[in-house]
Amino acid sequence: MACSRPPSQCEPTSLPPGPPAGRRHLPLSRRRREMSSNKEQRSAVFVILFALITILILYSSNSANEVFHYGSLRGRSRRPVNLKKWSITDGYVPILGNKTLPSRCHQCVIVSSSSHLLGTKLGPEIERAECTIRMNDAPTTGYSADVGNKTTYRVVAHSSVFRVLRRPQEFVNRTPETVFIFWGPPSKMQKPQGSLVRVIQRAGLVFPNMEAYAVSPGRMRQFDDLFRGETGKDREKSHSWLSTGWFTMVIAVELCDHVHVYGMVPPNYCSQRPRLQRMPYHYYEPKGPDECVTYIQNEHSRKGNHHRFITEKRVFSSWAQLYGITFSHPSWT
């Protein structure tokens, strides 16, 4: 009922309720529509977030279980690196004396450590080569009929330094003309305590004619960059190490006009070899691990400290025509 008295004397409670100050009263139907719209927006955001999280989980799972295939090679339009233009002077640091790594050879042979060389009687042919390159602690004593004796260069991994220097009569005195090229991460080669460089320098005091070089830190990065450029894979992210074979092949291409590789199998060898046939990984370790078991385990391992041997061989195959590389025993391109 309306108040018959003046407005100032009317009770406030007698006034009809109105909307709060500053707010506009909305019709009930509109409020319902807005509430429904807000719910739909929240649902859409939830669905999008759920989809993104699911995609991330699946991607992480696939990445963790990814097989290291050569399928993701460098882009076809990418111009390959010309290894012939790499600077020898900047890439290899003298450990003993102040010399520069001797280069060039017209014709080089790489003698692999493969047991495929056993029984080949290639020794005389290898001896006639202008320059002969061997790896790590692969001996010639007792195997010269198949692998020869001549050693112009020996490429040695940081993990094989002690195995080589413990047998100086085999690796230093037997072929005094040998030039040693040691490779390894700077943390291994030049760490403050127990530096491998110091170990090699002490050996040089005992054998003054020994000539040795280390792959420089800058060149080590180039080797990594080369692998990433050729395969599309980052070595560190794939939890692997480049093999001594990788370093040896690149060094041979740098130093030599033509390269003949003995004993290295093609990348598809293990998929075609009869399962019951066993071949030792090294010719000088007849009871050592099987060749294909070693290749396959290293290729697919995700636990680190492994080599991608098969992937590297595919890269070598792509280099064959580009750099004049020949493979034999077995023969392939």
Curated annotation (Swiss-Prot):
Sugar attachment sites: N98
Lumenal side: 65-333
Subcellular location: Golgi apparatus membrane
Disulfide bonds: C108-C256
Induction annotation: Down-regulated in renal cancers.
Topology feature Cytoplasmic, residues: 1-43
Biological process terms in GO annotation: cell-cell recognition; ganglioside biosynthetic process; glycoprotein metabolic process; glycosphingolipid biosynthetic process; glycosphingolipid metabolic process; glycosylceramide metabolic process; oligosaccharide biosynthetic process; oligosaccharide metabolic process
Membrane topology designation: Single-pass type II membrane protein
Catalytic activity: a ganglioside GM1b (d18:1(4E)) + CMP-N-acetyl-beta-neuraminate = a ganglioside GD1alpha (d18:1(4E)) + CMP + H(+); N-acetyl-alpha-neuraminosyl-(2->3)-beta-D-galactosyl-(1->3)-N-acetyl-beta-D-glucosaminyl-(1->3)-beta-D-galactosyl-(1->4)-beta-D-glucosyl-(1<->1')-N-acyl-sphing-4-enine + CMP-N-acetyl-beta-neuraminate = N-acetyl-alpha-neuraminosyl-(2->3)-beta-D-galactosyl-(1->3)-[N-acetyl-alpha-neuraminosyl-(2->6)]-N-acetyl-beta-D-glucosaminyl-(1->3)-beta-D-galactosyl-(1->4)-beta-D-glucosyl-(1<->1')-N-acyl-sphing-4-enine + CMP + H(+); a globoside MSGG + CMP-N-acetyl-beta-neuraminate = a globoside DSGG + CMP + H(+); a ganglioside GD1a (d18:1(4E)) + CMP-N-acetyl-beta-neuraminate = a ganglioside GT1aalpha (d18:1(4E)) + CMP + H(+)
Residues covered by region (Disordered): 1-26
Origin: domain of life: Eukaryota
Positions of transmembrane segments: 44-64
Annotated GO CC locations: cytoplasm; Golgi membrane; membrane; plasma membrane
CDD domains the UniProt entry points to: GT29_ST6GALNAC6
Entry GO MF terms: alpha-N-acetylgalactosaminide alpha-2,6-sialyltransferase activity; sialyltransferase activity
Biased amino acid composition, Polar residues: 1-12
Keyword Metal-binding in annotation: no
UniProt tissue specificity: Expressed in kidney, in proximal tubule epithelial cells. Expressed in colon cell lines.
Coiled coil: none
Keywords: Disulfide bond, Glycoprotein, Glycosyltransferase, Golgi apparatus, Lipid metabolism, Membrane, Sialic acid, Signal-anchor, Transferase, Transmembrane, Transmembrane helix
EC number of this enzyme: 2.4.99.-
Family (UniProt): Belongs to the glycosyltransferase 29 family.
Record's miscellaneous remark: The carbohydrate antigen disialyl Lewis a, which is at least partly synthesized by ST6GALNAC6, is a normal counterpart of sialyl Lewis a, better known as CA19-9, an antigen widely used as a serum marker for diagnosis of cancers in the digestive track. Disialyl Lewis a is predominantly expressed in non-malignant epithelial cells of the digestive organs, while sialyl Lewis a is preferentially expressed in cancers.
Protein task: Transfers the sialyl group (N-acetyl-alpha-neuraminyl or NeuAc) from CMP-NeuAc onto glycoproteins and glycolipids, forming an alpha-2,6-linkage. Produces branched type disialyl structures by transfer of a sialyl group onto the GalNAc or GlcNAc residue inside backbone core chains having a terminal sialic acid with an alpha-2,3-linkage on Gal. ST6GalNAcVI prefers glycolipids to glycoproteins, predominantly catalyzing the biosynthesis of ganglioside GD1alpha from GM1b.
Protein name: Alpha-N-acetylgalactosaminide alpha-2,6-sialyltransferase 6
